[in-house]
């Protein structure tokens, strides 16, 4: 298994990556924004993505987005192929793309919005802190990317103040003065997630 910076030589995997993201969102019922093969290819050609390969077989992927003229960076689209789940690969990909982000954008704040407890745990281990959406980028092009998420109506109903996703932020300036990243409490995050779902998800008619 190798995890490398994606480039033009990996564009043949773009359709499979796009389909894997879409299938994961459908099977898990989670809010994951869809990404077209063309969008993924652009990320690869710009050196803004990492890919995990088991020989010639696709195993995982994640890409970098920058907002506010490089002041904010997001690691998005983290996905592991079903054949390679349950072995800690997602964590390795997350660490690789985070390191790559810090090298390309050393002064940028790195943020994440996610509904997944596993991703929250990985973010917390890297030094991310939970924040309100107002502390994230106000770049409209970022929030436009949420339109393909099935929970987008929640974001619009709350005037972009809250969603089922939890916002998390790594601030390099604050990190210098706060070496303690804190501990991830899964019970607390699970309760927060359940509260959001109960409050914002529309009940299905019987």
Say what each PLM segment does.
Residues 5-8, 80, 114:
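Conserved residues at beta->alpha junctions
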Residues 80, 86-101, 110-112:
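Conserved acetyl-CoA-binding loop-helix of GNAT-fold acetyltransferases
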Residues 11, 83, 87, 117:
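Loop/helix-junction capping segments adjacent to catalytic residues or to phosphate/diphosphate-binding pockets
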Residues 18-82:
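A conserved beta-strand-loop-helix scaffold within acyl/acetyltransferase catalytic domains
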Residues 102-107, 111-206:
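Terminal substrate-recognition subdomain of acyl/acetyltransferases
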């Amino acid at each position: 298994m190798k995890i490398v910076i994606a480039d033009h030589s990996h564009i043949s995997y773009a359709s499979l990556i796009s389909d894997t993201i879409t299938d994961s969102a459908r099977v898990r019922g989670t809010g994951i924004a869809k990404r077209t093969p063309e969008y993924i290819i652009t990320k690869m050609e710009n050196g803004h993505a990492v890919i995990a390969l088991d020989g010639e077989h696709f195993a995982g992927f994640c890409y970098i987005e920058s907002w506010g003229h490089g002041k904010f960076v997001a690691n998005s689209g983290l996905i592991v192929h079903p054949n390679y789940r349950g072995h800690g690969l997602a964590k390795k990909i997350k660490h690789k793309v985070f390191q790559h982000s810090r090298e390309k954008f050393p002064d940028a704040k790195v943020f994440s919005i996610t509904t997944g407890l596993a991703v929250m745990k990985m973010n917390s281990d890297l030094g991310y802190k939970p924040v309100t959406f107002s502390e994230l980028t106000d770049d409209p092009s970022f929030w436009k990317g949420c339109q393909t998420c099935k929970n987008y109506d929640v974001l619009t109903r709350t005037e972009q103040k809250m969603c089922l996703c939890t916002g998390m932020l790594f601030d390099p300036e604050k990190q210098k003065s706060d070496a303690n990243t804190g501990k991830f409490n899964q019970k607390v995050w699970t309760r927060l997630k359940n509260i959001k779902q109960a409050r914002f998800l529309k009940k299905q008619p019987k």
